[in-house]
Amino acid sequence: DYYCSSANSYVWKGVFMKITKSDFGTTNTGENINIYHLENEAGAYVEILNFGCRLVKIVVPDRNGNPTDVCLGMDTMSAYENDDASLGAVVGRVANRIKDGHFTLNGKEYHLAVNCGTNHLHGGLIGYASKPWDAKIKDDKLILTMISADGEEGYPGNLTLTVTYGWSEDNELSIVYEASAD
């Protein structure tokens, strides 16, 4: 079903997929960030950063067959670090706002980091969109994982989040989210 035809090129159940990893830049804190390029046999591709689990490019043929990027992305690490819109990113622990930055769970009140006036937005001051994720290539998929520790941004419990990206010969992007908490 599976064999590696060359470095980072895979044939999985008869489908060719090329996955490459390149340096993208360095964060303000000195962490190296990589960009992953998933390309099908027709040459259409997606690019994903391990910083914020961000989609950077989706290049597919337009109606005339010309390769066209249909994803709103940026070109530099500093642009992503200063991005208030979370372009292409996985946000969290919560997407959107938590009014006044607090909630009650099982009778206990939790106070979260506030970053939008008095509100908590998209995970707080350092949400998932602003972190490096661990990345690995498995078969024809890119798997990104991060751990949010108990107390991070004020949230209770440890959380492990895994996001798996796939890219098909039909130019279909698949994204699978899996989370577990204690």
Predicted regions: what is each one?
Residues 1-16:
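Short, Lys/Arg-enriched N-terminal segments with co-localized hydrophobic residues
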Residues 17-182:
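Surface-exposed acidic/polar loop and edge beta-strand patches at domain peripheries
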